[in-house]
Amino acid sequence: MAISHNTLAFTFGMLGNVISFLVFLAPISTFYRIYKKKSTEGFQSLPYLVALFSSMLWLYYALLKKDAFLLITINSFGCVVETIYIILYIIYAPRDARNLTFKLLSAMNVGSFALILIVTNYAVHGPLRVQVLGWVCVSLSVSVFAAPLSIVAQVVRTKSVEFMPFNLSFTLTLSATMWFGYGFFLKDICIXLPNVLGXVLGLLQMLLYAIYRNGGEKAMKKEKKAPIEPPKSIVIETQLEKIEQEKKNKDDDNEEKDKSEEPIGCGV
């Protein structure tokens, strides 16, 4: 007996929900460290703002489409989780990073989303409204999937996969495959199309990982084998050490002085 398209769409959608659920929870360790250290440690808020914006758009699209319940479940969860991440970031970020986050949040997640709401509710009507919103979602998803191309270029240039973990590439490829299947059997090109690009780029990343996974180790071995030049003069080295020690002692004194002048409990 042949399996219906609705059954296959539900199966792929459920698997997509499970995998995307894990992807949304992946930054928990990062934000736990931020919470423990009370510092964002140079992390950027843009990826989480974009993820929230994407979840908001896909949730709105699913509500208008009315037959994409599994898109509603995962993107509702995504909106909640990404909002929590952003709140934690704002609490512990330095002033400049916090101000930039507020500006991006206002421009993208509030301003742009409000503009899309106005256009899709007053400028276009009926089936055209869903189509316009769908292609907006496609454009955003394509730009998000294309973002790791800079990492791909870095891997090819450095022949090292240090900044492209295999597990993440594999998970995102699997997620794109599941959502492509969901869109394909649901006969929704707006869901399926961007995930074709996502899967292709994911496979490319895994291929590069297989090619360059030993690149970093070879570079380290090469550095270890490089001959170490002996010091030209023990006398000169000793004199330099004395100068460095005197400089260090002077810097330590200045540092202690600076610490004593630092205001206690000053808000960032």
Curated annotation (Swiss-Prot):
Record has Ribonucleoprotein as a keyword: no
Membrane topology: Multi-pass membrane protein
Residue ranges constituting the MtN3/slv domain according to the UniProt record: 10-96, 131-214
Cytoplasmic compartment spans: 29-42, 92-103, 153-165, 212-268
Span of the signal peptide: none
Coiled-coil regions listed in the entry: 234-262
GO cellular component: plasma membrane
InterPro entries xref list: SWEET, SWEET_rpt
Annotated GO MF terms: sugar transmembrane transporter activity
Entry annotated with the keyword Nucleotide-binding: no
Induction description: During nodulation.
Regions of compositional bias (Basic and acidic residues) in chain numbering: 243-262
Superkingdom as given in the UniProt entry: Eukaryota
Keywords, alphabetical: Cell membrane, Coiled coil, Membrane, Repeat, Sugar transport, Transmembrane, Transmembrane helix, Transport
Extracellular side: 1-7, 64-70, 125-131, 187-190
Region described as Disordered: 243-268
Transmembrane segments annotated in the record for this chain: 8-28, 43-63, 71-91, 104-124, 132-152, 166-186, 191-211
Subcellular location: Cell membrane
UniProt main location, coarse: membrane
Described function: Mediates both low-affinity uptake and efflux of sugar across the plasma membrane.
Quaternary context: Forms homooligomers and/or heterooligomers.
Family according to the record: Belongs to the SWEET sugar transporter family.
Name of the molecule in the record: Bidirectional sugar transporter N3
Organism: Medicago truncatula (Barrel medic)
Gene field: N3
